[in-house]
Amino acid sequence: MASDIAQERFAPDAPFRFVGGDPSVDFVNTADWTPRGLERDRFTSFDRLVEWAHGAELLDTAQARRFAQAAQRHPRRATATLDDAREFRHLLQDLLASVVSGRESTPSLDRFNTLVSNTARHARLVRAPGGRLTRGWDALGDAPESLLWPVVWRAADLLASAETDRLRVCGGLDCGWFYVDRSRNGLRRWCEMSVCGTAEKNRRRAHR
């Protein structure tokens, strides 16, 4: 039974949805945060992690290919990076939840700051097409673990911004996804109206 439950926790075929308004929020939204705990974990392999980062536009196609090659050269490090990604996702989920609820989460913040410090060592200014300077990364893609650097940095940018005032959690049953509410009136309730909003309407209809 325990092994069946463990298998049900993962969702290797579930699509990634980019509805959070920020890549770091979409990173947390790669699993469903239900009252029973984490379900439908879409990070089932390092390849899926690369697929998500490419879809979130944190990697271009060439960089995604480099990470796939790095995983072939360093399979154990790729597996360790997948484990680190899941652990970081839990940490970031706790931080986002603390922002939404207004509670303090000092242990999670301390751990996050350690990640930010370690990540900052790899940040560089690089020339973008056209000659403009932009932030880049030292040897991004040479090692599987470098995949998490852009995610950590985008999370730090978000948490240090005024956008946290617009951070919300979906009101859908068994969803728990977060999003930055940039609606005109600031009254968005769902991660996606077509998914959780419609499901809630159908539930209400069924109980009439």
Protein language model annotation of sequence segments:
Residues 147-208:
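BZIP DNA-binding basic region
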